[in-house]
């Protein structure tokens, strides 16, 4: 399939345990700073564990500054990151040529753990999306993608295809998830949690460290040479198991091959591989 529109990533932002904003996160990474700390909050886990949590005090301050402190925590993060993207780019969601994609695996799942002032339906992804889109007056142009660990990649591919098919000129893609008791107990049941900082692909690896974050990018059909180009992407389904991919790697192989074909890229052209593996045990 030949595409005539190029999709650029023109702006980005991120909130994580390493900081608020892309620059703070970059500086922390360049300084070899880790966001992983020992967590003892019973709302997160029954027993202490190593994880990366963002500053609740800073989140509360920023949420109060824009009047969203009454929203669930996940929605606060989405609104803050999207707001920052709008501030950077000048692109508003009231513009009907701009779409909004929210990517998450669990959304407001933390609301299940305790009684709150929020209605029961707040835990549903559609309600989370409705609240966030309502804040930005974009109720008719919000889409939610929840596809386990590839939710973010799936959302970027969906945004790219929307631009290529002329549905939108620009798309804000935001993704986020929180650390909650639901999440830690789930990974704990798989015995996937490490008691030390994780060592991906190391011979002595023994699990992962969980974390929470929220980020957003602006995809656009217009850009310059200084912008990142989203040149190819693909999603496959190996129909293996709900909690694990095929051991033969067929699904991953098909997705990589299709993405490279779409981008017109050969294996020898690849200089960096960003790999993801849950616990990699």
Features from the language model and the residues they span:
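Condensing-enzyme catalytic core mediating Claisen C-C bond formation in acyl metabolism
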Residues: 2-15, 22-51, 193, 197-265, ...
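Conserved catalytic cysteine-centered active-site region
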Residues: 3, 37-76, 107-158, 167, ...
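Conserved small-residue
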Residues: 11, 29, 82, 100, ...
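Acidic, glycine-rich active-site loops and adjacent beta-strand->loop/helix elements
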Residues: 14-15, 104-107, 147-151, 175-180, ...
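Conserved active-site "lid/cap" helical segment
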Residues: 23-103, 255-267
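Structural element of the ATP-grasp superfamily
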Residues: 82, 132-133, 218, 256
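Beta-strand segments within the central parallel beta-sheet cores of soluble alpha/beta enzyme folds
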Residues: 99-102, 143-146, 171-176, 227-233, ...
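Hydrophobic pocket-lining residues that define ligand/cofactor binding sites across diverse proteins
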Residues: 162-163, 263
């Amino acid at each position: 399939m030949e595409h005539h529109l190029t999709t650029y990533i023109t702006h980005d932002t991120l909130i994580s345990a390493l900081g608020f904003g892309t620059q703070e996160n970059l500086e922390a990474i360049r300084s070899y700073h880790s966001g992983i700390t020992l967590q003892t909050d019973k709302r997160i886990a029954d027993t202490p564990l190593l994880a990366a949590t963002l500053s609740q005090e800073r989140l509360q301050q920023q949420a109060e500054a824009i009047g969203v402190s009454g929203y669930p925590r996940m929605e606060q993060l989405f609104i803050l990151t999207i707001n920052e993207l709008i501030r950077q780019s000048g692109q508003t969601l009231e513009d009907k040529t701009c779409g909004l994609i929210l990517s998450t695996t669990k959304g407001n799942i933390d609301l299940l753990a305790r009684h709150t002032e929020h209605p029961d339906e707040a835990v549903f992804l559609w309600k989370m999306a409705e609240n966030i889109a309502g804040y930005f007056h974009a109720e008719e142009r919000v889409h939610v993608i929840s596809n386990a660990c590839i939710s973010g990649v799936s959302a970027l591919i969906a945004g790219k295809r929307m631009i290529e098919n002329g549905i939108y000129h620009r798309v804000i893609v935001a993704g986020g998830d929180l650390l909650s008791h639901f999440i830690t107990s789930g990974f704990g049941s798989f015995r996937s949690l490490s008691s030390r900082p994780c060592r991906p692909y190391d011979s002595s690896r023994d699990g992962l460290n969980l974390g929470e974050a929220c980020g957003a990018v602006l995809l656009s059909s217009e850009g310059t040479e200084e912008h990142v180009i989203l040149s190819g992407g693909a999603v496959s389904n190996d129909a293996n198991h709900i909690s694990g991919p095929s051991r033969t790697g067929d699904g991953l192989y098909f997705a990589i091959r299709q993405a490279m074909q779409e981008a017109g890229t050969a294996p020898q052209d690849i200089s960096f591989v960003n790999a993801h593996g849950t616990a990699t045990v």
